[in-house]
């Protein structure tokens, strides 16, 4: 997903006092890079000893974004059952890029519900959003709210709670703040446990936040993933 995952308000931004107008594909906003987003491109690929590499070239002005940019995404799998996803980008001018992947996980198998998955996210704040999913700039403390996963909790416990943020998003679609600074340190972003199968998963990242999405806008959201 790119050039920029999630929404950019009013499909525009300013760099060095110059405003760039983007493709508005989500009402008045840009979502996932617009109609020209990386998810609509045919990538080049090559096999790696332990995975696969995808590469793409995006020219200056594509989707309204400035700068020629080359991106690489590596998927690697090792003998410790660790899947790593690494994004690389190179450009020669000031621009914005915020890549992600859209992998979803259901630890009890296809067609099963995720509501009994136990989730832990070591974050005490989320980004507050508008009904159009645009961050307001405020940070909301999760304590005593449905968004508190600081202790292991079934996803379904508060999934349908009467909270405006959940109602707008048809469930969880929120950015959890893991740290306040940018660093290369890998931290645990989330851990997931499915009690029937005993399967578990830990997510690590060097980025300052993780987004929890329970696929409320999918056809069968309760059988999707997180």
Role assignments for model-derived ranges:
Residues 1-226:
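An exposed, glycine/acidic-rich loop-and-rim segment of catalytic or binding clefts
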């Amino acid at each position: 997903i790119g050039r920029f995952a999630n929404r950019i308000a009013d499909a525009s931004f300013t760099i060095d006092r110059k405003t760039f107008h983007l493709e508005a594909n989500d009402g008045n906003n840009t979502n996932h890079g617009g109609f020209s987003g990386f998810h609509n491109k045919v990538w080049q690929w090559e096999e790696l000893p332990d995975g696969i590499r995808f590469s793409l070239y995006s020219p200056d002005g594509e989707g309204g974004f400035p700068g020629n940019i080359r991106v690489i995404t590596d998927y690697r799998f090792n003998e410790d059952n660790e899947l790593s996803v690494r994004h690389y980008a190179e450009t020669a001018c000031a621009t914005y890029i915020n890549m992600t992947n859209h992998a979803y996980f259901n630890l009890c198998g296809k067609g099963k519900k995720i509501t009994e998955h136990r989730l832990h996210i070591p974050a005490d704040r989320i980004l507050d959003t508008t009904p159009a999913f645009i961050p307001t700039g405020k940070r909301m403390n999760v304590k005593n709210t449905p968004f508190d996963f600081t202790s292991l909790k079934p996803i379904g416990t508060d999934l349908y709670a009467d909270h405006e943020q959940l109602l707008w998003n048809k469930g969880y679609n929120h950015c959890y703040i893991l740290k306040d600074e940018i660093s290369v340190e890998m931290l645990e972003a989330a851990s997931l446990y499915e009690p029937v199968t005993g399967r578990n998963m830990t997510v690590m990242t060097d980025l300052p936040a993780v987004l929890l999405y329970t696929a409320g806008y999918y056809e069968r959201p309760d059988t999707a993933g997180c």
